[in-house]
């Protein structure tokens, strides 16, 4: 891509993650949540078919989690395929087409969100989401 085409794309993607007004700000001045959203925008610049997220909210202050989840929800609504490792069970239940629950490195459930959260088969799966969702 030409240098001339980079800036408009960057601004469009920063706008998509709610940070267009921070386009001229140094990364060190951004909060953790803002830095995470910039990372998502950078990834989107590559036009991926699939986005991989590994605990995208785990290092964030609780008040910043919602902004990241909102960006991810928008990506899901736009049709982006995402593989996400998360402990955010409410998010997984709302956004996922498929939920895989792992315990000690093994897949113990692989279901639709409805099935996973209303009729889990594995004892560990039964305990975990309800414990997280009822915090």
Question: Regions from the language model: what does each represent?
Answer:
Residues 4-21:
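Conserved ABC ATPase "signature" region
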Residues 26-30, 34:
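Conserved ABC ATPase signature
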Residues 40:
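Hydrophobic anchor residue at the start of the ABC signature
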Residues 45-49:
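A short, proline-enriched helix->beta-strand linker immediately N-terminal to the Walker B motif
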Residues 51-54:
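Catalytic Walker B motif of ABC-type/P-loop ATPase nucleotide-binding domains
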Residues 86-87:
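H-loop/switch region of ABC-family ATPase nucleotide-binding domains
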